[in-house]
Structure formats: structure tokens, C-alpha cells
């Protein structure tokens, strides 16, 4: 099946102008949900969807869906859906999300121009706030579409300035009505950049994801005693940061040891808030954010328990008080069998031997998989770079992956 790589590139490069930033290397953009660059990106997408003959709707949380109903197909037949997101992280790259959205549109165009006779509608979907940079933890639009979060709760979410999602979407003209319901889809398939270098190292343009790792976030607090850095002897200190540093190293050790049996395991303390955070003051309090991931939930639990044990030991040995809360928890998400096998067959049909792989990053597909059969494809990321202007996927790889997506969508819809 033929796809138009030049048209795909044009759409992605046009989207890259919305929120474009100056970068010493590469191309970057900042398009947070509900901002003017996000509005321009959404408006361009709607124009392109309508130009391809898709009927566009926007739901209450700003999810955009363009639906193509082939001749002779009942409009209410469960659709095959495909897409991704258009929001970005601050100073992010131009492929993360937009590749999946515009590859989805190009896949529909390819099916429209082929001799394939789909028995189902095909929907191109752009989810709201995948990145979680302004509202909530991320994967917001897909969590609502999957029924994991209510429209009302999502609209009440506010950014650091107190602006709610409801207000932000209204201001850019994308506060629609109703709820996009993923349970009404027969299947879902997403194309995304890999955000790692495994495909590049293997020289393969397409990866078929088997499982998306689970994610646990834990909020950790260590409280000691604030004191004068010069006047307080070393023997008399209850240094919260020194105690927290032991915890960070213990988490690293626990995760490294876990990889001997599970090479998908990772553990990261990625956020520290030190109080009072002054050079001449012994730290009295440290707040930390712990991120644990694996394709095996038992491994995640084991690392979390090692973290708890570390904190208990530190409490005893360092005369500090501690707190630990497992605040966010998503189990590993296996892709459905047919949404793994169909793209694998599509790869073979176009002469590509795909790489089977897991995803260490979260994607909207995680939530959609709770509502219908779901699959995820990867395209290579140069040097594994992402969430940065250095993020890059060669245009030839974009086209090859889009061709596989088109073949997959065609097969799922017939």
C-alpha cells in the first residue's frame, strides 16, 4: 500500500512551526495543552482531517476525532482507531506525538486510495494532555476515553496558576461536548517514536511493542533538624539531605539488582525538594519523587518494598522521621494478541523484519488497552533522544513505519 512520505513530512513540519523554539541543535517546540501553539496545532489538524473527508468531532476534554465511513459501511459499526497526541513537553521535539497523529491520517489516505474495501469506519484520534506538563499526571484524554477518569474530574484539574482544563480548552475553542468512548472501537493502534536507541542499533525501521511497562510513583519525605551549617558539629546533626542521599543510592542498588532477572526494571528518584535549600543551613526536610517501572508487576512491588525497607533503616539509624506514599500506580499493559500479530504480518508484507520490544515510557495506548484491543508501533529515535530538540526520526523511517501502520489499519478494518 502506497503512502505519501512527502505529504506526511509536510504535515509534521507544519505542526513543528506551532510553538517553535530556537535551538542550537535540532528542532524544538513548546505546545502545552490549552496554549495558543496547541490551538494552532489543533486547528491545522481539523483542517487536514476535513480535507481528507473525515467528519470531525471534539469531546468535552478536547479529544479530537476524525471519522471516515467507507461507502456501504453502517456508520455505527465499531471503528478501527489510530492516532496519538499533539501536546509537547517544554522545549520538546517535533516527532513525539505528531508522528502518530499524522501517520494515522496518512494511513487513512492510503486506504482511501487503495483497492481495500474496509468493513469498518476508521478514526484518527488526537488525545488531550498526553504529556501531563500542565494538567495532572498525563495520559489525560485517553484516561477519559477509556472510562478511567470522569469528564467532570478532568475538567476541574488546574495548572500551577489555577487555570482549569475547562477554562483552558474554552479559551482555545476546543471545549467540546460528550465523551469519546474507546469501548466503541473494535481496535486501536498507535505509532510513536521509540525514545530509545534499540531500533537504531538494530537497523530496523519498525518495532512492535509487546508490553508497556507499569509505572509506580511514590512520594517520600525525610525530616531531620534545620541547623546552622557552621555552628552545628557533625555529631549533633540530623541532616535530612544526607539521609535522603542514602535512600537514593539504595533505590539505585535495588533497581540494578532487579535487572539480573528482569532487564526492563528501572528505579529513579527524579525529584528532590530540599528545605530550606540554603548553602549555610543543614537541611531539615527533603521531599522526593520515586519512579519505578517494569513489565513485571512483581518486580515493581519488590523494588518498592526495598525502598520502604531502606527508609525504615534510615529512620532508625539517622534519627529522622520519614513518610512514604505510593501515590500513582499503573500495572504493566500487554498489547492484545491480534494487535501484535497484525502489524507483524504487515511488516513482513512490506519486507521489514520488525523488532519485538517493550515500551519503558507511558503512552495513551495504556489506557485504551483497558477498553479494547490495542497495539503500539515504534519508529527509530536517533541516539535515543526525545523530549528535546535533538529528537529525530529519519523521514525514510517515518514513511516506512507509516506504511506498516496503513497496512495494519487496512487489515484490522476488513
Residue ranges and their predicted role:
Residues 82, 92-130, 218-222, 233-254, ...:
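Alpha-helical metal-binding/catalytic segments enriched in His/Glu/Asp
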Residues 8, 21, 80-83, 354-404:
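Zn-dependent metallopeptidase/amidohydrolase metal-coordination segment
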Residues 23-69:
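A non-catalytic alpha/beta surface segment that caps or lines the substrate-entry region
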Residues 228, 237-258, 307-309, 379-414:
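His/Asp/Glu-rich mid-to-C-terminal helical/loop segments that flank catalytic regions of hydrolases
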Residues 30-33, 268-277, 289-291, 321-340, ...:
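A short beta-alpha structural unit
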Residues 1-28:
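N-terminal hydrophobic or amphipathic helices/low-complexity stretches enriched
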Residues 18-22, 162-210, 242, 248-256, ...:
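Active-site-adjacent substrate-binding region
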Residues 129-130, 136-297:
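Midchain, well-structured core segments that form catalytic/ion-binding scaffolds
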Amino acid at each position: 500500500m502506497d503512502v505519501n512520505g512527502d505529504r506526511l513530512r509536510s504535515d509534521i513540519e507544519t505542526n513543528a512551526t506551532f510553538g517553535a523554539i530556537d535551538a542550537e541543535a535540532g528542532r524544538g517546540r513548546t505546545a502545552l495543552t490549552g496554549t495558543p501553539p496547541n490551538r494552532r496545532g489543533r486547528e491545522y489538524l481539523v483542517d487536514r482531517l476535513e480535507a481528507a473527508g473525515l467528519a470531525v468531532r471534539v469531546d468535552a476534554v478536547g479529544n479530537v476525532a476524525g471519522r471516515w465511513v467507507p461507502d456501504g459501511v453502517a456508520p455505527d459499526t465499531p471503528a478501527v482507531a489510530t492516532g496519538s497526541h499533539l501536546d509537547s513537553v517544554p522545549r520538546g521535539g517535533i516527532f513525539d506525538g505528531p508522528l502518530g497523529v499524522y501517520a494515522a491520517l496518512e494511513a487513512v489516505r492510503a486506504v482511501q486510495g487503495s483497492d481495500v474495501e474496509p468493513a469498518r469506519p476508521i478514526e484518527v484520534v488526537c488525545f488531550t494532555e498526553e504529556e501531563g506538563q500542565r494538567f495532572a499526571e498525563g495520559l489525560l484524554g485517553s484516561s477519559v476515553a477509556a472510562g478511567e477518569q470522569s469528564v467532570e474530574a478532568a475538567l476541574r484539574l488546574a495548572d500551577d496558576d489555577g487555570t482549569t482544563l475547562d477554562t483552558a480548552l474554552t479559551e482555545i475553542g476546543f471545549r467540546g461536548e460528550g465523551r469519546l468512548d474507546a469501548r466503541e472501537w473494535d481496535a486501536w493502534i498507535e505509532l510513536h517514536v521509540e525514545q530509545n536507541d534499540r531500533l537504531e542499533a538494530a537497523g530496523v525501521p519498525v518495532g512492535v511493542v509487546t508490553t508497556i511497562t507499569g509505572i509506580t510513583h511514590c512520594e517520600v519525605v525525610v525530616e531531620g533538624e534545620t541547623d546552622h551549617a557552621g555552628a552545628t558539629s557533625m555529631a549533633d546533626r540530623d541532616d535530612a539531605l544526607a539521609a535522603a542521599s542514602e535512600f537514593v543510592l539504595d533505590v539505585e542498588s535495588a533497581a540494578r539488582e532487579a535487572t539480573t532477572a528482569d532487564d526492563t526494571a528501572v528505579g529513579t528518584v527524579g525529584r528532590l525538594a530540599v528545605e530550606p535549600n540554603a548553602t549555610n543551613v543543614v537541611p531539615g526536610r527533603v521531599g522526593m519523587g520515586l519512579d519505578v517501572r517494569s513489565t513485571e508487576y512483581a518486580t515493581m512491588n519488590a523494588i518498592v518494598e526495598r525502598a520502604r525497607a531502606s527508609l525504615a533503616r534510615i529512620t532508625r539509624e539517622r534519627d529522622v522521621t520519614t513518610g512514604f506514599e505510593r501515590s500513582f500506580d499503573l500495572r504493566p499493559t500487554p498489547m492484545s494478541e491480534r494487535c501484535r500479530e497484525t502489524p507483524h504480518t504487515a511488516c513482513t508484507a512490506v519486507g521489514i523484519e520488525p523488532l519485538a520490544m517493550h515500551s519503558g515510557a507511558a503512552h495513551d495506548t495504556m489506557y485504551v488497552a483497558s477498553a479494547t484491543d490495542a497495539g503500539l508501533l515504534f519508529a527509530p529515535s536517533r541516539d535515543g533522544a526525545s523530549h528535546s530538540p535533538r529528537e529525530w526520526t529519519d523521514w525514510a523511517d517515518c514513511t516506512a513505519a507509516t506504511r506498516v501502520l496503513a497496512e495494519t489499519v487496512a487489515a484490522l478494518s476488513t
